[in-house]
């Protein structure tokens, strides 16, 4: 199962999945990507 959560540290609109993933990894998550109509950075990891 994959858990997802909005990044606490990502600022501004999410336009790069790579940048989002890097921020998520710094927060202790496995990665992340831009998601939804508002392009929020969502972090992911196994749970």
Swiss-Prot record:
InterPro entries: Defensin_plant (IPR008176), Scorpion_toxin-like (IPR003614), Scorpion_toxin-like_sf (IPR036574). Disulfide bonds join 3-47, 14-34, 20-41, 24-43. This is Defensin-like protein 1. Gene3D superfamilies: Knottin, scorpion toxin-like (3.30.30.10). Coiled coil: none annotated. Inhibits protein translation in cell-free systems. GO terms for biological process: defense response to fungus; killing of cells of another organism. It comes from the Eukaryota. SMART domains: Knot1. It comes from Hordeum vulgare.
């Amino acid at each position: 199962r994959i858990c997802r959560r909005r990044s606490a540290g990502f600022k501004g609109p999410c336009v790069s999945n790579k940048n989002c993933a890097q921020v998520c990894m710094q927060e202790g998550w496995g990665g992340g990507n831009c998601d939804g109509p508002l392009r929020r950075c969502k972090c992911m990891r196994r749970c």
